């Protein structure tokens, strides 16, 4: 029987060999954390390699994602569908083993990690989801949700500010099933961290309210084993296990230095490591005995079967709850969703209201949350401004309301967004979280990660323009809406009234293949009249709101607008119409969605031969030339805003009927 060290060495040499073959990568972290991983994965981790999507599996997140060969080695050795050939294709085009772990490639990878600090933050989201789902569905004697979230992280993760946001909240919420392993090796890319990272990490996390187990020898399996047992015994606080490790452990000449952090060791050093660790096997060769001891398939199948029996007993005792649990973990919408949500939209169209779109958003939440118990909302300390609370909101606390449906994220925009991604990845919830659009900047990378991972995170942004007014340019978005539109696989909506707002929310809920950004105003907006056909076309991202004649070839001019500027476009069209100009107005609440429509529909809205076009949006002007062409005009922002009442600002920056008409006449 192989020793624990030999089992860990299998990770080390797979990592060394794969990085060497790829001619790039990070061998140091996998070599340094191999002993910790061996104990966690073989003694504690509840998982089934034959079914990576088992609902009650433990979640493992590698926050220091540059050490990706660690998780790839673990998945391969324990029996997931990740072959030795897949490891040989590390970092190659279209492989299952990209340079950083990516969700949806290798089975068993729970989240995409790489930008440091986001993995630990995703892990907080996973742990919130587990605890909340457990309190919503578990009943005495029927614990169908009962799993841990384990996360590996390094110095870089703890230096990133997002780790403070996430770990502070995790302590406040008492996430007792979150267990983090800190790879305390004192090395980062630039060298020994003494010159730039001297925090007392133990005191830092104790101040957050975490249970901290310090000074664990990360190469001593007995100490690691005991630390995990202690961590599992503490059920009211998250645990940080501080593991003293040697980066590149086993490399005689490069261990404990930054030389092994982010580059192949080299053939000579790998040969020296083989001799040092007494590993007599060829590259990518693992003895059958070691494979047998690592294989977790049988153990995992037994564990899942036992859970299925528990679920069957639960279904017998609580059939309605069991059906609801199954629906939610399968990410299926309620049977009445389509009809009820459409009825709500039609009701709004039939009952006009001139309200701020942020208020329209709250009304949509109120209507939809009653249909969607999986909604898990929140705001970054701006609930009264973002209007994200509804009549059934139940804020989650560490002990009280652990079965709630709303998270007070505090002033943590980046943390909130990455936590939402963890909640979405976990399953059972549709997370939404809000802040001012300007503060999206703090969270931009987490929004991008949601899009990359194709997760249904709903990012709500209010106070969307200079319409914010007196708070001034520090709080007035200019380029933010366009920046969001440029993120691949993110659908960005900027609705013009309560109807478009409700449609945007509906589209976001129904979109399973990616996130949405929902952008709303502070100021009131007039509701637009629509025919049934126009109402149906709102969901297509852009549509003709004002026709000038039956024949689509007839317009002299097309005005394109979004959000608060749609009303302005309609008023300008009335003035031009009175002067004999045939004007079509296109409302385009989502350029992303409109661009995905078939060519015939896009041509019906924006006929290519009608080149006289003006776009109107209280955001950066440059974005709109893709629609109006170089000969067109854009009424938009080309500078930062000012501190003044909103009506004065709109006039100052040219968002007036007179200016829109003047711009139109320049090209007529």
Curated annotation (Swiss-Prot):
Positions bearing the site annotation: Important for catalytic activity: 26, 261
GO biological process, one term: pentose-phosphate shunt
Residue numbers binding Mg(2+): 155, 185, 187
Catalyzed chemical reaction(s): D-sedoheptulose 7-phosphate + D-glyceraldehyde 3-phosphate = aldehydo-D-ribose 5-phosphate + D-xylulose 5-phosphate
EC number(s) reported in the record: 2.2.1.1
Family classification: Belongs to the transketolase family.
Role noted for this protein: Catalyzes the transfer of a two-carbon ketol group from a ketose donor to an aldose acceptor, via a covalent intermediate with the cofactor thiamine pyrophosphate.
Enzyme class (EC, first level): transferase
Cofactor: how bound: Binds 1 Mg(2+) ion per subunit. Can also utilize other divalent metal cations, such as Ca(2+), Mn(2+) and Co(2+).
Oligomeric form and interacting partners: Homodimer.
Obligatory cofactor(s): Mg(2+); Ca(2+); Mn(2+); Co(2+)
Organism this protein belongs to: Pasteurella multocida (strain Pm70)
Binding residues for substrate: 26, 261, 358, 385, 463, 471, 522
Residues noted as binding thiamine diphosphate in the record, renumbered to the chain: 66, 114-116, 156, 185, 261, 439
InterPro entries according to UniProt: THDP-binding, Transketo_C/PFOR_II, Transketolase-like_C_2, Transketolase-like_Pyr-bd, Transketolase_bac-like, Transketolase_BS, Transketolase_CS, Transketolase_fam
Keywords: Calcium, Magnesium, Metal-binding, Thiamine pyrophosphate, Transferase
Gene Ontology terms: cellular component: cytosol
Active site per UniProt: 413 (proton donor)
Protein name, per record: Transketolase 2
GO MF annotations in UniProt: metal ion binding; transketolase activity
């Amino acid at each position: 029987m192989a020793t624990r060290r030999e089992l860990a060495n299998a990770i080390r040499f797979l990592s060394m060999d794969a990085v060497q073959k790829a001619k790039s990568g990070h061998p140091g972290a996998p070599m340094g954390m191999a002993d910790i991983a061996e104990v966690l994965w073989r003694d504690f981790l509840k998982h089934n390699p034959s079914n990576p999507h088992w609902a009650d599996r433990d979640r493992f997140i590698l926050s220091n994602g540059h050490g990706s060969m660690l998780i790839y080695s673990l998945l391969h050795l324990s029996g997931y569908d990740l072959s030795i050939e897949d490891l040989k294709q590390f970092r190659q085009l279209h492989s299952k083993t990209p340079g950083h772990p990516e969700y949806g490639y290798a089975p068993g990878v729970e989240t995409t990690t790489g930008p440091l600090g986001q993995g630990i933050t995703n892990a907080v989201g996973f742990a919130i989801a587990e605890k909340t789902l457990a309190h919503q569905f578990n009943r005495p004697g029927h614990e169908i949700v009962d799993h841990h979230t384990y996360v590996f992280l390094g110095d870089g993760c703890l230096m990133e500010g997002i780790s403070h946001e996430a770990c502070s909240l995790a302590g406040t919420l008492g996430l007792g099933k979150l267990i983090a392993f800190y790879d305390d090796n004192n090395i980062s890319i630039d060298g020994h961290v003494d010159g730039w990272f001297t925090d007392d990490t133990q005191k830092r996390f104790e101040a957050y309210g975490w249970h901290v187990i310090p000074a664990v020898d990360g190469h001593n399996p007995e100490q690691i084993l005991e630390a995990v047992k202690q961590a599992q015994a503490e059920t009211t606080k998250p645990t940080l296990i501080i593991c003293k490790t040697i980066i590149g452990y086993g490399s005689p000449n490069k261990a404990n230095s930054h030389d092994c952090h982010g580059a192949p060791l080299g053939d000579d050093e790998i040969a020296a490591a083989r001799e040092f660790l007494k590993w007599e096997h060829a590259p990518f060769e693992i003895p059958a005995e070691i494979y047998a001891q690592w294989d977790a398939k049988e153990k995992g199948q037994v564990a899942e079967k036992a859970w299925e029996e528990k679920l069957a007993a639960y279904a017998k005792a609580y059939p309605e709850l069991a059906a609801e649990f199954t629906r939610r973990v399968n990410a299926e919408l309620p049977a009445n969703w389509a009809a009820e949500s459409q009825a709500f939209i039609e009701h709004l169209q039939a009952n006009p209201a001139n309200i701020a779109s942020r208020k329209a958003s709250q009304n949509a939440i109120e209507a939809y949350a009653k249909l969607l118990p999986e909604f898990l909302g929140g705001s970054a300390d701006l609930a009264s401004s973002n209007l994200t609370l509804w009549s059934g909101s139940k804020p989650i606390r560490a002990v009280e309301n652990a079965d709630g449906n709303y998270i007070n994220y505090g002033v943590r925009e980046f943390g909130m967004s990455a936590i939402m991604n963890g909640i979405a990845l976990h399953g059972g919830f549709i997370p939404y979280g809000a802040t001012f659009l300007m503060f999206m900047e703090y969270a931009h990378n987490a929004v991008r990660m949601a899009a990359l991972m194709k997760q249904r995170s709903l990012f709500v942004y209010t106070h969307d323009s200079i319409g914010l007014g007196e708070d001034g340019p520090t709080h007035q978005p200019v380029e933010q809406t366009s920046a969001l539109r440029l993120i691949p696989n993110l659908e960005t909506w900027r609705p013009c009234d309560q109807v478009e707002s409700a449609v945007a929310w509906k589209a976001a809920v129904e979109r399973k293949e990616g996130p949405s950004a929902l952008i709303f105003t502070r100021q009131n907006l007039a509701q637009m009249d629509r025919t049934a056909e126009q109402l149906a076309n709102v969901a297509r991202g852009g549509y003709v709101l004002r026709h000038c004649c039956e024949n689509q070839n007839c317009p002299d001019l097309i005005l394109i607008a979004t959000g608060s500027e749609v009303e302005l476009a309609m008023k300008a069209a009335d003035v031009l119409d009175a002067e004999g100009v045939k004007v079509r107005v296109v409302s385009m609440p989502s350029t992303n969605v409109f661009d995905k429509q078939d060519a015939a529909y896009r041509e019906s809205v924006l006929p290519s031969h009608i080149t006289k076009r003006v776009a109107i949006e209280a955001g950066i002007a440059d974005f709109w030339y893709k629609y109006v062409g170089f000969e067109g005009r854009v009424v938009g922002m080309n500078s930062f805003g000012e501190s003044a009442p909103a009506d004065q600002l709109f006039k100052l920056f040219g968002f007036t009927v007179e200016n829109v008409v003047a711009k139109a006449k320049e090209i007529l």
